[in-house]
């Protein structure tokens, strides 16, 4: 068999929390199994207790015709209020009777009184699918000083409306207050056969599985909730206060201030019941007692602050969008906050309101409030802008034209987490517009890296122990912003590669997440996607000096050198000279591996190990593993010498083939594109193709369709699989033998004959080339005929 007969070029390049810990059903069942005798004794004991209690009440002095117990009577009789303990032995649902018998088998417990500062069954959103628990409520610990075992008494506090984050949802509905971050829909982009690029905007489904702490306060609005989100399993929420969205918090503060003045003195023994449901934003309207319309904005300046807040608390039904925009120009910060809060609420998901707000010049007025002296005004102005620009290209452009990027970066320097979350959320929304990406990259990358990425990743300074919930959300927003920018033009990718500290921060954050066991986090997904995009066409776009360093003097140069230029007594065909490129690879490898910085990380041998760890440890987030495989595909693509070096590093040192094949068995079509593309590149550069054939061929044949009824992967995946098989067949008889043994010929002939679409035409041509190469193995012709195949099946049209 002659090597020249092979068509070598045919396929080559391309949880709520409750203060009453109730017994479980299992315990109640066990207590009920005590028998009739125990029931009779218990009933007699209770009757004796009631008789003794009535006798004691008849002996006490009466006040206004009522018997009043002495203050310490309960304690002296041993009937002090008890505390429930979770799943404690001997607990019974019958333990709420009063007993004078201290030796009784149970502890009498009186009905506990609620305190608004204590936990209630409505104190956390029901997010059972993600095991998310609110961790604090009005300053109280989620589990108290004694942990979850008992409810600690808390001093009475004034009531306040329960925010929407503290209400129990219906069923297991998730908190849907995340709309203004849903601007990044990554749709399919153009790919060539060798490279892998994450396209530009995140799909809504891709942004619905945020970490729990990212959901604490993702959105700027507070008036809408919905269910059905895809929450991740087993998320952890660091201890923090329950967060309410700005508009709800502001409007409820106005109402609480009014209600607290209407409450009389404290009544001994009174029980303050928590509000079961927070009033809606619409119920907190602005109205005046003596008029049916809103007065001029400047008229409010003559009111004292106390009187203003009293009037503001009456409701929100009479305010409209034009009035809210006018409030933005008021001198009273309370009115500015109210105006921004209304705009934020109104523009949550109302496209008409966003258009009306732009026509009323709300955008420039909000921009002027980004750096207001009052931080509450800043928070609500940025929150309103975040909703205003969501899914509205005109409002995004208006923000940029009003010098909004400069003002946002000034605001980003404020050490207030709420502000920084809003600013990074606005930047993320802006980055979904293709025509703004280049300008955003030019104006924001350096400051965003210095102010957010480097400090929160621990790169270039003292290592970061752990991000709190707010810092994690800020970092997540920032990496989402970079993810969108990285899918823009070549110039934007190059600017991101050259931005000092950006790549270092991303690599450091991924390493920290792997060490902490948090590789499923969405910020890790964003970071890996950015690295994948920055690796796209890397060898064509990298600095020439770096490329020359990586290329060195390769095998091609040595093989093509004239005999007179060969130093020493070795001819170009000698074994010694053939070993020189391997020595050059090792020398360049050791040199490049030393302390990579900046864009050097993109082609460093250390990055291969990082991607391999992600492929092996990340089990739930398929987007992360897809991005890691895509990044490896990019840096092993093409005919460059360094692509071959990294391919052999992945195969021989990182042992990446088995993790890849494990992924191929269960991967969806999106993952298969990256995985098969990577295996295709590895098969071209593998030194031992016989060993690779033994591991790969049978797994890939399983993915090929063999009949019309069988489910087939996309044409791009089929082409990648056939290309891998072709790379192995032309160099390894074992691959050809395994194709016959594992019924690969039948599937290849089926693919070859199926030409019912342009995509199937591509896979058909690939199958034809592979079959033609298989026929070159003369020793297998007898086996082919024994299986019922003829020459026309291999070489025919």
Curated annotation (Swiss-Prot):
A GO-annotated cellular component: cell-cell junction
Tissue specificity comment: Expressed in the epidermis of the skin, in squamous non-cornifying epithelial cells in the vagina, single layer epithelia of the duodenum and pancreas acini and non-epithelial dendritic reticulum cells of lymph node follicles (at protein level).
Stretches the record annotates as Required for interaction with GSK3B: 294-724
SMART domains listed in its UniProt record: ARM
Xref: SUPFAM superfamilies: ARM repeat (SSF48371)
Sequence positions bearing Omega-N-methylarginine: 81, 261
Membrane topology note: Peripheral membrane protein
Post-translational modifications reported in the UniProt record: Phosphorylated at Ser-285 when localized to the cytoplasm, PKP3 at desmosome cell junctions is not phosphorylated. Phosphorylation at Try-195 by SRC is induced by reactive oxygen species and potentially acts as a release mechanism from desmosome cell-cell junctions.
MF annotations from Gene Ontology: alpha-catenin binding; cadherin binding; cadherin binding involved in cell-cell adhesion; cell adhesion molecule binding; enzyme binding; RNA binding
Keywords associated with the record: Cell adhesion, Cell junction, Cell membrane, Cytoplasm, Membrane, Methylation, Nucleus, Phosphoprotein, Repeat, RNA-binding
Ranges for region Required for binding to PKP2 mRNA: 516-797
Main location: nucleus
Modified residues (Phosphoserine): 123, 180, 183, 238, 240, 285, 313-314, 331
Keyword Phosphoprotein: yes
GO annotation terms (biological process): actin cytoskeleton organization; cell-cell adhesion; desmosome assembly; desmosome organization; epithelial cell-cell adhesion; epithelial structure maintenance; negative regulation of mRNA catabolic process; positive regulation of cell adhesion
Annotated spans, Required for interaction with SFN: 283-288
PTM sites of type Phosphothreonine: 250
ARM repeat residues: 305-348, 351-390, 393-432, 449-487, 491-536, 596-637, 645-684, 689-730
InterPro entries reported for this sequence: ARM-like, ARM-type_fold, Armadillo, Plakophilin/d_Catenin
Function: A component of desmosome cell-cell junctions which are required for positive regulation of cellular adhesion. Required for the localization of DSG2, DSP and PKP2 to mature desmosome junctions. May also play a role in the maintenance of DSG3 protein abundance in keratinocytes. Required for the formation of DSP-containing desmosome precursors in the cytoplasm during desmosome assembly. Also regulates the accumulation of CDH1 to mature desmosome junctions, via cAMP-dependent signaling and its interaction with activated RAP1A.
Family designation: Belongs to the beta-catenin family.
Subunit structure: Found in a complex composed of CDH1, RAP1A and PKP3; PKP3 acts as a scaffold protein within the complex, the complex is required for CDH1 localization to mature desmosome cell junctions. Interacts with FXR1; the interaction facilitates the binding of PKP3 to PKP2 mRNA. Interacts (via ARM repeats) with GSK3B; the interaction may be involved in PKP3 protein degradation. Interacts with hyperphosphorylated and hypophosphorylated RB1; the interaction inhibits RB1 interaction with and repression of the transcription factor E2F1, potentially via sequestering RB1 to the cytoplasm.
Additional notes on this entry: Poorly differentiated, high Gleason grade prostate adenocarcinomas show an increase in phosphorylation at Tyr-195, potentially indicating a role for SRC-driven phosphorylation of PKP3 in the dedifferentiation of prostate tumor cells.
Protein name: Plakophilin-3
Species, as recorded: Homo sapiens (Human)
């Amino acid at each position: 068999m002659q090597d020249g007969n092979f068509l070598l070029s045919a396929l080559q390049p391309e949880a709520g929390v409750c203060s009453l810990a109730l017994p479980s059903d299992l315990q109640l069942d066990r207590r009920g199994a005590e028998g009739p005798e125990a029931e009779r004794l218990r009933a007699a004991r209770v009757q004796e207790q009631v008789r003794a209690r009535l006798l004691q009440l008849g002996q006490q002095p009466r006040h206004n015709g009522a018997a009043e117990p002495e203050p310490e009577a309960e304690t002296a009789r041993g009937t002090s209020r008890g505390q429930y303990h979770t799943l404690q032995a001997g607990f019974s649902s019958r333990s709420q009777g009063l007993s004078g018998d201290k030796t009784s088998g149970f502890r009498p417990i009186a009905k506990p009184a609620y305190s608004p500062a204590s936990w209630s069954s409505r104190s956390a959103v029901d997010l059972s699918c993600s095991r998310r628990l609110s961790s604090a409520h009005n300053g109280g610990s989620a589990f108290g000083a004694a942990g979850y075992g008992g409810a600690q008494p808390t001093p009475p506090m004034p009531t306040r409306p329960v925010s929407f984050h503290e209400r129990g949802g219906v069923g297991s509905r998730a908190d849907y207050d995340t709309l203004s971050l849903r601007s990044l829909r990554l749709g399919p982009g153009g790919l060539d056969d060798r490279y892998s690029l994450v396209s530009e905007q995140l799909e809504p489904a891709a942004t619905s599985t945020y970490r729990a702490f990212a959901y604490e306060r993702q959105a700027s609005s507070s008036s809408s909730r919905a269910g059905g989100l895809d929450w991740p399993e087993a998320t952890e929420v660091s201890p923090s206060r329950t967060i309410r969205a700005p508009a709800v918090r502001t409007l409820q503060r106005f109402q609480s201030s009014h209600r607290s003045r209407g409450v009389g003195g404290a009544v001994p023994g009174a029980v303050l019941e928590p509000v079961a449901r927070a009033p809606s934003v619409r119920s907190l309207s602005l109205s005046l007692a003596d008029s049916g319309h809103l007065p001029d904005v400047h008229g409010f300046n003559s009111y004292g602050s106390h009187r203003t807040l009293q009037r503001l608390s009456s409701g929100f039904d009479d305010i409209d969008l034009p009035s809210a925009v006018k409030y933005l120009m008021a001198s009273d910060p309370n009115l500015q906050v109210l105006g921004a809060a209304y705009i934020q609420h109104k523009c949550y998901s109302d496209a008409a309101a966003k258009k009306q707000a732009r026509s009323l010049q709300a955008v420039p007025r909000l921009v002027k409030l980004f750096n207001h002296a009052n931080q509450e005004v800043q928070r609500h102005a940025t929150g309103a802008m975040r909703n205003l620009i969501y899914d509205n290209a005109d409002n995004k452009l208006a923000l940029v034209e009003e010098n909004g990027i400069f003002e946002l970066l000034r605001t980003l320097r404020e050490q207030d987490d709420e502000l920084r979350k809003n600013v990074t959320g606005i930047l993320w929304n802006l980055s979904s517009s293709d025509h703004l990406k280049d300008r955003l990259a030019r104006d924001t990358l350096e400051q965003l890296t210095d102010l957010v990425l480097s400090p929160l990743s621990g790169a270039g300074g003292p290592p970061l122990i752990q991000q709190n919930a707010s810092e994690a959300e800020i970092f997540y927003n920032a990496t989402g912003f970079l993810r969108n920018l990285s899918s823009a033009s070549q110039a934007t990718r190059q600017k991101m590669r050259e931005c000092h500290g950006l790549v270092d921060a991303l690599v450091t954050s991924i390493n920290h997440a792997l060490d902490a066991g948090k590789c499923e986090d969405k910020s890790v997904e964003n970071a890996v996607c950015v690295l994948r995009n920055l690796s796209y066409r890397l060898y064509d776009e990298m600095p020439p000096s770096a490329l020359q360093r990586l290329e060195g003097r390769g095998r091609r140069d040595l093989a093509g050198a004239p005999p007179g230029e060969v130093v020493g007594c070795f001819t170009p065909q000698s074994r010694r000279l053939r070993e020189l490129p391997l020595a050059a690879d090792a020398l360049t490898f050791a040199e490049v591996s030393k302390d990579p910085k900046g864009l050097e990380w993109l082609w460093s041998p250390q990055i291969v190990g990082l991607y391999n760890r992600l492929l092996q440890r990340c089990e739930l987030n398929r987007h992360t593993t897809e991005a890691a495989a895509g990044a490896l595909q990019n840096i092993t693509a093409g005919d460059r010498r360094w692509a071959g070096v990294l391919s052999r590093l992945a195969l021989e040192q990182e042992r990446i083939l088995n993790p890849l094949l494990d992924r191929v068995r269960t991967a969806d079509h999106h993952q298969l594109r990256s995985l098969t593309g990577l295996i295709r590149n590895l098969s071209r550069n593998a030194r031992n193709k016989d060993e690779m054939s033994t591991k790969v061929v049978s797994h890939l044949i399983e993915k090929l369709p063999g009949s019309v009824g069988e489910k087939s992967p996309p044409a791009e995946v089929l082409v990648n699989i056939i290309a891998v098989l072709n790379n192995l067949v032309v160099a390894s008889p074992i691959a050809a033998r395994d194709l016959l043994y594992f019924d690969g010929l039948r599937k290849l002939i089926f693919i070859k004959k199926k030409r019912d679409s342009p995509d199937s035409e591509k896979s058909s041509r690939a199958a034809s080339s592979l079959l033609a190469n298989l026929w070159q193995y003369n020793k297998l012709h007898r086996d082919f005929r024994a299986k019922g195949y003829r020459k026309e099946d291999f070489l025919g049209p």
